[in-house]
Amino acid sequence: MRVAYFSPMPPERSGIADYSALLLPALRARTDVTVVRRGARRPPRGTDVSLYHVGNNPDAHGWIVDALAREPGAVVLHDFALHHLVAGVTLGRGNRDAYLDVLEREHGVVGRLLGYGVIDKRVPPLWESRALDFPLASFVLEHATGLVVHSRYVRDRVRAAGFDRPAAVVPHPAWPVPDVAPERVAGGVVIGCFGVVNASKRIPELLRATAALRRKHEQVTLLLVGPTSPGFDLDRRLQRLGLDGDGVVREEWVDERRLWALLGGSDVLVNLRHPTMGETSGSVVRGLSLGKPLVVSDVGWFAELPDDVALKVAPDGDEVATLTAGLELLATRPDVRDAMSANATALARREHDVDRVAELYVAALERTLGGGSVDDAVLHEVTAAAADVGISADSAEAREIARRLAEVELG
């Protein structure tokens, strides 16, 4: 099987570029993969299936959706809400009619009228204020012959949107832990938060919880790593909460080795967001590999993490109180941290191993090419193999096999 691989690649500053750099060696060990150069309009001649990585950043993925529209293929859908991407490749290129057409196709006349309001600046940009209500995923789904997604949440959303072609849930691959010494930024418990600093990552709530926690446990330090979004006044918030003197350590962009060092030096990792665009988190997956206890929002992919590796915080009226209580538990109970750590590393090995992920990718691509005939052949082969080794239909082994098959919507 000859695969044309469309994706951002290093040195682009993109989580999906890092993802592809991790996945490609394992995928190439199993099938013939050609990485398509950035800006290419079509796959190379002789390609059996094209694989398009699509995220919500128009700068990184605009050329990829252009190629997808010319040559349909399998899509790795890294985000479900794609409004920012669609706006970038329509309005961002001066094509307001295309933007209005997509809105009307997905949301009827109401969508089109709101689109006029956005264009005339009478309505805030929908990709900033209402992205989940107007995801515009059909812009990509209509050209996809099959999907790879990373959560049941996204699979259910695309099914609800009417997508009826193959859709496989494939875990985000885990990076091997590099030989990098952990870097401690403070002497007490360090709570690490990695990613863009803005309101949708619940940074205001995290800062309030940190301030409340430090009133009882002043040895706790919050480490914030990542760029600050324009318009988010972090310094003013720190000052208002009394965190501008100490209690918070700030880092902007860091390279890969420093990222691992700071992750390794954190005792707890926090990754919050609301709303979710259906995305996963590379820093959370790295944290699993390192065995770090997690605190996440109870939304999307994050809600699907096992309870024994992640404390979950609902983005509701009790969010700050729940977050403060969870952080206090982890800051004061090393035994709880140790138990969650062991569970996290086991999960990373069991579910997120890059070779296992590559096998699931190949199965998904073959299914995209072969459709129902491949489904039937795989099910027949698995059923026969299970019977040969004496696995009964009601056994624990059979239930585990069924769970694995369900990940790629077989069985």
Please provide the spans of the model-predicted regions:
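Carbohydrate-associated surface elements
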Residues: 153, 173
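Glycosyltransferase donor-sugar binding loop
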Residues: 221-234
